[in-house]
């Protein structure tokens, strides 16, 4: 996917704050500190568009990024951060449920899992939630450069088995640091654009 323009256009906590253009949306979900901001910057070829923090739990809103003026990439609040009150966790859960259940122009939710660790109970719940609302599913295994390639298949099996992934679910290893797996992820998203006949221009990035 050739990225010509990308900008953050909205941060929202309620439906009345969502963008109203009705453009197609692709959402990214995952635990705090799983690497969502780094992935956004990498796939959009921007260094600091999404703020990367070493402190988990920084994303507390739904952040909408307008891509090529044709669709939105939506960064969902990270879950699983221990130093958050029960009330705040509950409000985040309601925010996510409201968005996932009442957004007709949302076409896919991509779940990010740290390849190094077994998916947590909250990861499993999020996966089931995504399936419940009828999305793909695409699972991205982040930080794939942090383990030896010889260990990848072992960790892929761990992720698939723990989440209970279907054989048709896509599991894509990604390294934002080394820019590995980016084309594969865009390919999976482009398939969704085509399958749903979305008016999104699919133009490949020229080889470097």
From Swiss-Prot:
Naturally occurring in which organism (per UniProt): Alkaliphilus metalliredigens (strain QYMF)
Q: Which GO terms describe its biological process?
A: division septum assembly
Name the NCBIfam families for this protein: GTPase_YsxC, small_GTP
The family note in this entry says:
Belongs to the TRAFAC class TrmE-Era-EngA-EngB-Septin-like GTPase superfamily. EngB GTPase family.
| UniProt name for this protein | Probable GTP-binding protein EngB
Q: Which CDD domains match?
A: YihA_EngB
Q: Name one GO cellular component term.
A: cytosol
**Cofactor(s) annotated in UniProt:** Mg(2+)
Instruction: Write out the residues that bind GTP.
Output: 30-37, 57-61, 75-78, 142-145, 174-176
Which GO molecular-function terms appear in the entry?
GTP binding; metal ion binding
In this chain the EngB-type G domain maps to 22-195
Q: Does the keyword Aminoacyl-tRNA synthetase apply?
A: no
The alphabetical list of record keywords is: Cell cycle, Cell division, GTP-binding, Magnesium, Metal-binding, Nucleotide-binding, Septation
Annotated Mg(2+) binding lies at: 37, 59
Q: Which domain of life is it from?
A: Bacteria
Please describe what this protein does.
Necessary for normal cell division and for the maintenance of normal septation.
């Amino acid at each position: 996917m050739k990225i010509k323009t990308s900008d953050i256009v909205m941060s929202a906590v309620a439906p009345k704050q969502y963008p109203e253009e009705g453009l197609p949306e692709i959402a990214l979900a995952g635990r705090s500190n799983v690497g969502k901001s780094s992935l956004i910057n990498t796939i959009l070829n921007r260094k600091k568009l999404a703020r990367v923090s070493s402190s988990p739990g920084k994303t507390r809103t739904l952040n909408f990024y307008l891509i090529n003026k044709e669709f939105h990439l939506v960064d969902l609040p990270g879950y699983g951060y221990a130093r958050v009150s029960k009330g705040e966790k509950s409000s985040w859960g309601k925010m996510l449920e409201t968005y996932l259940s009442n957004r007709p122009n949302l076409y896919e939710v991509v779940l990010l899992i740290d390849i190094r660790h077994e998916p947590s109970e909250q990861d499993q719940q999020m996966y089931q939630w995504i399936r419940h609302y009828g999305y793909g599913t695409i699972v991205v295994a982040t930080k794939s450069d942090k383990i030896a390639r010889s260990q990848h298949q072992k960790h892929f099996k761990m992720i698939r088995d723990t989440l209970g992934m279907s054989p048709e679910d896509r599991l894509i290893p990604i390294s934002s640091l080394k820019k590995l797996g980016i084309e594969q992820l865009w390919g999976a998203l482009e398939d969704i654009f085509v399958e749903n006949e979305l008016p999104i221009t699919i133009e490949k990035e020229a080889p470097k």
